[in-house]
């Protein structure tokens, strides 16, 4: 799981570099888990890409990985524009766009977070979000170490 996150960040580094956004990976311990690598890579990539996409120049996106005896935890935090309180309950809906005024300058299908959520639920996991407008967003993902599909 550590290598998976390293690969995601390595792949997204050039995109982040265009906006001078620092990608930080904090790994608190080696984590080995039974996962569908393709689906989980897509899910975490979506979160990191959003962190880059909805960020300010010279911002940061921090990805951290931790685990206990039962679950592993991935947190994706950013210094971006944040999500308005009245939108937070809708962000995992398909085609929901938080800010329509930015949609012309920010590419996307509106499916990213819906796909992310379903991939995490498929792993019997959970995803939570905390956000404050103009202060950034933190997505917290919890997935059992042994998921049976």
Please identify what each model-predicted range represents:
Residues 58-70:
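Short beta-strand/loop element within the Bergerat-fold HATPase_c
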Residues 78:
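Acidic ATP/Mg2+-coordinating residue in the GHKL
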Residues 124-125:
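Conserved glycine-rich
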Residues 83-97:
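Short conserved segment of the HATPase_c
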